[in-house]
Amino acid sequence: MSKQPVSNVRAIQANINIPMGAFRPGAGQPPRRKECTPEVEEGVPPTSDEEKKPIPGAKKLPGPAVNLSEIQNIKSELKYVPKAEQ
């Protein structure tokens, strides 16, 4: 009766999360280009409402854009249906 050494089993268990082909040359992430990295200063959105430009012809409507009570009614009607056995 031959038994495998315990160290071999531990080595196999330690390598479970390594993806296939991870040890091949060139398998790492490619270097990032400077032109692809976003600059923080460019993408800063305006923080107050005065800085935002309104869309011409747009009207400010009262209330939310979606009827919330309708969504809540539909959500309350939903119920869990178990899978039918075949």
Swiss-Prot record:
Positions of the UniProt region annotated as Disordered: 20-64
Listed InterPro entries: Chisel
Any one Gene Ontology cellular component term annotated for this protein: muscle tendon junction
Assigned protein family: Belongs to the SMPX family.
Protein function: Plays a role in the regulatory network through which muscle cells coordinate their structural and functional states during growth, adaptation, and repair.
Protein name in UniProt: Small muscular protein
Species per Swiss-Prot/TrEMBL record: Pongo abelii
